[in-house]
């Protein structure tokens, strides 16, 4: 998809701050420092729309972006970062749960994981949480450029088995460095968004 407009609308922590309207919405989740910001910047053809932090756990708000005036992307704070306090973790959990369980505009979630390593316990918990609430999920297996091509399928198999991926949930090989999987990611997203303008 050609992205002509991508800008932040609001950083929210409560439902009354979420944007109104009925635009299709895609949430983007993943472990801290997994490459989620790079994924967003790559598929939106933007170098610095989402700041790539060297400090994990930096994003503590739900960041709503409007794309081509047709849909919202929602950058969800990264999970699994050990150095945040218990109270911060509890606040994060409440904010995330509220968003995922009450947001009617949400069409699907992109879950970004690192293809180089088996999914972590936190990745499994996040995927199980999304499945519990019957939220369609697209799994982006990023950093594929860091693995020899001949080993991609082996690593993908580990991802699918560890997460116990449900039928119908796509797993897309991706690299922010090479652009691999960019088109496939958009195709997967468009299956869930109600927009017909793509």
Curated annotation (Swiss-Prot):
This is Probable GTP-binding protein EngB. CDD domains: YihA_EngB (cd01876). Necessary for normal cell division and for the maintenance of normal septation. Keywords: Cell cycle, Cell division, GTP-binding, Magnesium, Metal-binding, Nucleotide-binding, Septation. GTP binds at residues 30-37, 57-61, 75-78, 142-145, 174-176. Its cofactor is Mg(2+). Belongs to the TRAFAC class TrmE-Era-EngA-EngB-Septin-like GTPase superfamily. EngB GTPase family. PANTHER family: ENGB-TYPE G DOMAIN-CONTAINING PROTEIN, MSS1/TRME-RELATED GTP-BINDING PROTEIN. InterPro entries: G_ENGB_dom, GTP-bd, GTP-bd_ribosome_bio_YsxC, P-loop_NTPase. The gene is engB. GO terms for biological process: division septum assembly. One of its GO terms (molecular function) is GTP binding. SUPFAM superfamilies: P-loop containing nucleoside triphosphate hydrolases. One of its GO terms (cellular component) is cytosol. It comes from the Bacteria. Residues 22-195 form the EngB-type G domain. The keyword Amino-acid biosynthesis does not apply. PROSITE patterns: G_ENGB (PS51706). The keyword Nucleotide-binding applies. Disulfide bonds: none annotated.
